[in-house]
Amino acid sequence: MPICIQNELPVKNKLLEEGVVVIEENRAKNQDIRPLKILILNLMPKKEETERQLLRLLGNSPLQITVEFLHMTSHIAKNTAQSYLEKFYKTFDEVKDKYYDGLIITGAPVEQLEFEDVNYWGELNSIFEWSKTHVFSTLNICWAAQASLYYHFGVKKEQVADKIFGVFEHDVLIENHTLTRGFTDTFLAPHSRHTRIEEEKLPTISELDVLAKSEEVGTLIAATKDFRKIFVTGHIEYDANTLHNEYVRDKNSNLPIEVPVNYYPGNDDTKVPKNRWRGVAYLFYHNWLNQVYQQTPYDLTELGK
């Protein structure tokens, strides 16, 4: 089934070129279908790149999905024109009276700051709290996973000596869980972060299941038992060249950065990296949307009751 996005969203043509099925909002409004409503809070600097990565995965579902984008008003974007945000993004004030089947909160390049020092922390707290009564399932990615675990459960983050950067092997810990159904017993996924969560605290949280974990870099996927909060500490949505672009950026800026682990063929950064996690990404998002579809109420206003 197609994914419904704004008619003039620039990434639409790129998605069509990739074979992603897209339906324009004008046509979708004339169909007698209750699509899943997904809101994406995009905190990444390169908005269009992240839009494309997530829409590609959402568009692989057999379900019809309507997507809206959200940005923070308490933060001035440095890499995206305000006119672009005003045209294609909503503010929290514009969506706070609405209800959504799912909310995706992306990572953000602020992980080396204390949570309370992030300039939009107060606004994000309001969104976390609002999501309890207005969103069925919230998927938190990378820094957002750390922030959400901290807000909801008091799990702190810790600085690591060397950046967790590369493609790591993970083990599925709970067989046949709805989010990891169809995964191989071990699988690869990218990470790119300077911090880790308090791993030792996760087993003490009775509402939480750890679903996939790496011996090298810790938890990748966790979820509350009621499916309302999902946490992914890595970046399974990344393109094949995203880690490469981050590596080149930091190298050119003379920042301390090592070659991404297990990423380039032969560990040679002159060779083209391969995407070895694409299947996992598609399957994970398919599983998430499928469970949202099955469990969310038809009348979303029931979430607040």
Please tell me what each predicted stretch does.
Residues 47, 76, 112, 147, ...:
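Flexible, glycine-rich phosphate/dinucleotide-binding loops
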Residues 1-72, 89, 95, 99, ...:
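Amide-donor transfer/coupling interface in amidating biosynthetic enzymes
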Residues 50-53, 79-82, 115-116:
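Short, glycine/acidic-enriched capping/hinge loops at junctions between secondary-structure elements
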Residues 73-86:
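N-terminal beta-loop-helix "entrance" segment that forms/cooperates
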Residues 105-174:
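Cysteine-nucleophile active-site neighborhood
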